[in-house]
Amino acid sequence: MQIFHNLNEWIRFRNSLSPDLSLGFAPTMGNLHAGHASLFLASSKENHYTVSSLFVNPTQFNNPDDYKHYPRTVDADLELMTQNGVDFCILPNENEIYADGYAYQVQENRFGQLMEGKHRPGHFNGVLTIVMKLFNLVKPTRAYFGEKDYQQLLLIQGMVKALFMDIEIKSCPTVREKSGLACSSRNNRLTPSQREIADEFAKIFHQNKSSAMISKELEALGITVEYIEEFQGRRFAAVKIGDIRLIDNYLL
């Protein structure tokens, strides 16, 4: 795997590639897990080359403490990429990515204001802006995103369509642990006792009950429920176990 620490170096290399070659792209913030690996493998099966990026994007954290405590595990992340078909990895720094000081932003004013957008003001502005910047840098044929962040996936699909971007957005199924808990970088921050509660959250959330009944059962376990909502035939949830925030969704 070839690693690029400098954006100009990457741009020169990208421009040297034949336009006949397909590039798959799976952007990440690091602290990788099996869900990320599934994106890399899906890309490597469908493209000549697979590109990823490691960048903890400060503009999508509405809580500064979340950004501060987000695990940085670069060496392990690069190893996982190497083992799962990534050919090129971009490791940009914040000054390069936000040379404009975040003066220019991508904003969606409808669906992005619901659920995650309502509870994390500014979050999706940061997500869409960094994804747009990375798309312009990588110029991928296809880009891969997990269904765990389903609202994010829909917004990225919408952005690509609205702005006439010639990129195919591929959705990949949520990867889950044996307990049914969705793989997430945040899971690593759970204490053993919190982890048991998180496993119960996954089980209860997937029960065939009303959202109100599910909320009541979760709250009885000491879980803070931010929302459980249904949208376009899916059920979405965001909860807090201690100070660890977890999200999930599934098709009804």
Swiss-Prot record:
Which annotated residues bind (R)-pantoate?
60, 152
Query: Main subcellular localization, coarse class?
Result: cytoplasm
Q: Which UniProt keywords apply?
A: ATP-binding, Cytoplasm, Ligase, Nucleotide-binding, Pantothenate biosynthesis
Q: Which SUPFAM superfamilies match?
A: Nucleotidylyl transferase (SSF52374)
Q: Name one GO biological process term.
A: pantothenate biosynthetic process
Its annotated pathway? Cofactor biosynthesis; (R)-pantothenate biosynthesis; (R)-pantothenate from (R)-pantoate and beta-alanine: step 1/1
Instruction: Give the active-site positions.
Output: 36 (proton donor)
Gene Ontology MF terms: ATP binding; pantoate-beta-alanine ligase activity
Q: Which residues bind ATP?
A: 29-36, 146-149, 175, 183-186
Q: Catalyses which reaction?
A: (R)-pantoate + beta-alanine + ATP = (R)-pantothenate + AMP + diphosphate + H(+)
Root EC class: ligase
> Where along this sequence does the record place binding of beta-alanine?
60
E.C. no = 6.3.2.1
UniProt subcellular location: Cytoplasm
One of the record's GO cellular component terms? cytosol
Q: Which InterPro entries match?
A: Pantoate_ligase (IPR003721), Pantoate_ligase_C (IPR042176), Rossmann-like_a/b/a_fold (IPR014729)
Q: Which Pfam families match?
A: Pantoate_ligase
Fill in the misc note. Answer: The reaction proceeds by a bi uni uni bi ping pong mechanism.
* Subunit details: Homodimer.
Family according to the record: Belongs to the pantothenate synthetase family.
Its job:
Catalyzes the condensation of pantoate with beta-alanine in an ATP-dependent reaction via a pantoyl-adenylate intermediate.
Q: What is this protein called?
A: Pantothenate synthetase
| Annotated gene | panC
